[in-house]
């Protein structure tokens, strides 16, 4: 629809959904990951290096380089800022998601965790990686196969997304 096309960029989120496993069958519960500060800094530096190395010649000279100022147009500060905005928004969404999902599902002791997973490394939009529970736990595994549980968790995800956009 026209409305959804106009709002497309506003509503962009990446929610990567998984189930976890543990050598301990008693380990169970929901968790959500966002990019760690260390991962953020490393990723921003990689993007800056990559962007800075992609200058190519065109008819007008070296693309990506401001010949008057003698420096690359890719501003490291802007890259860092994009990562920080995405990370902050991801953090906010993760906190809301933990609150909503924990109304219907058990959560780990520290349900909001930090990692450097590839799916969390976009500076273009907020992203979270969700572990719904542990396939190695009987209770979690039963939940994964229960349509009522699936539906209630899906509804909690929708509530979290809606609350995040208010």
Feature locations, PLM:
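Single conserved hydrophobic/aromatic residue that forms the stacking wall/gate
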Residues: 1-11
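Extracytoplasmic segments of membrane-associated envelope/inner-membrane machinery
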Residues: 42, 48-80
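A short, glycine/acidic-enriched catalytic loop
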Residues: 22-57
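Active-site-adjacent substrate-recognition loops and nearby beta-strands
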Residues: 27-32, 49, 60, 106-118
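Structured binding elements
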Residues: 15
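Active-site-adjacent mobile loop/cap segments within catalytic or ligand-binding domains
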Residues: 74-166
